[in-house]
């Protein structure tokens, strides 16, 4: 409607374009894979702040982060298409947005890397499948309440970074925020398979 268009034109567009610019700025091109990657981040799950025994913070290619980046970039490009020509030109001038940068957004939004386990499970981040399975039953038996698992492990001189254990929904957040159709479109755009069973399979795993 008219009010939405007005908001988009004068406030929303500038915000989403700047957010897209941020995602573009933290994407790194990997020439060996011809894919873009987002390195050294923490996804929604606070149990994984770094790789086991690494002194560098963050993990690489968190699926939630990478998909959200692709979504923002595609929405930003759509917004520019929606704006009246004069407003679009004005915004591009104010933000110093040129065709080359928009071309980069387009490229990143089609070549962002996602990582999968061998069986097609979406990896929470690169290397998640190499982590150790956590002994949930053993720890419940030993401690009863293991809600603060991070504190329990740290008291034992251990860290949740080593285990397949999550404090917050991470990959699963994607299925909450996007419909299966939206996710299929994003995966298709990236050239990755998204089957009918992808969602139940991942929900079951995580």
Question: Where on the chain are the PLM-derived regions?
Answer:
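Conserved functional hotspot residues or short segments at active or partner-binding sites
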Residues: 16
